[in-house]
Amino acid sequence: MSAAPLVRDVDRLDPAGVAAVLALLRAATAADGVRPLSEEAELRLQHGGPAGGRDVLATAADGALTGYARFEGGEGTGDAEAELVVAPGSRRRGVGRALLTRLEELAGDRPLRVWAHGDLPGSAELAQRHGYERARVLLQMRRELAGVDPEPRLRLPEGVQVRTFRSGTDEQAWLRTNARAFASHPEQGSWTAEDLRLREAEPWFDPAGFFLAWDGDRLLGSHWTKVHPPGDEGPEAVGEVYVLGIDPDAQGLGLGRALTDVGLAHLRRLGLRQVLLYVEEDNTAAVTLYERSGFTRHAVDVSWRRAR
């Protein structure tokens, strides 16, 4: 019988601790075929996050890292959120249970939501055993790029022009439009200048794949694409419809379709064979639209919630 894991949490990991967690994430990705943490959680692991966040570590008696969780305390009385991963060689040894127990202690009297990426059987079993219920479901959808026109003829409203993002110039306009486009979205609509800055500093950031639709000096919408390197979302590089948003006042002008075409054409010209996107399962209108555009369901992320 293995000894119970040792669990501790810190405000911020040192570089050696971050490196150890990143190695664990790579091992879990290779074993499960899905990244165990969201991009946001990985950024906060590496760069820190808002007040109330904690890095939670589980280790064996010999000090080996067996599990990790990222806890976000949130603000006010809202739900606390977390994501966790257990090392492939340490599963079904109480590590997930120990991490979850500490996350619940950190949440205190507030409800806790825990994201499970890939909706793997082990994560569902752990959540249900501890009284959690499915609260949100995020679909990953994919399509082939072979049928995409690499040089599409765009139908844009009169006076509207599409150009690529200019770092150091377009940030504030994009943040304002993004907040309006995603006013009802719990994560995307709350992006700050720091959130954008961190992504501009990432190795994958490429302004040549970040398209903005302007009417004079007014930003109407954007399509930000991303390229995942081999091993990130599969054995080959994969494109992503990273952020596609239209200002509510510009809805109905056909900009969503035009910007989608521009972004997919860009990814096709890069030689990529597949593109992915994420959409809420209960957003049936968007899911239907994407299915009509050739996307099919590929993977599922689940937010499990337990009321206190």
Swiss-Prot record:
Acetyl-CoA 2 binds at residues 244-246, 251-257. Gene3D superfamilies: 3.40.630.30. Acetyl-CoA 1 binds at residues 84-86. Residues 8-155, 160-308 form the N-acetyltransferase domain. It is an enzyme of class 2 (transferase). GO terms for molecular function: mycothiol synthase activity. Its EC number is 2.3.1.189. Catalyzes the transfer of acetyl from acetyl-CoA to desacetylmycothiol (Cys-GlcN-Ins) to form mycothiol. Monomer. PANTHER family: AMINOALKYLPHOSPHONATE N-ACETYLTRANSFERASE-RELATED-RELATED. This is Mycothiol acetyltransferase.
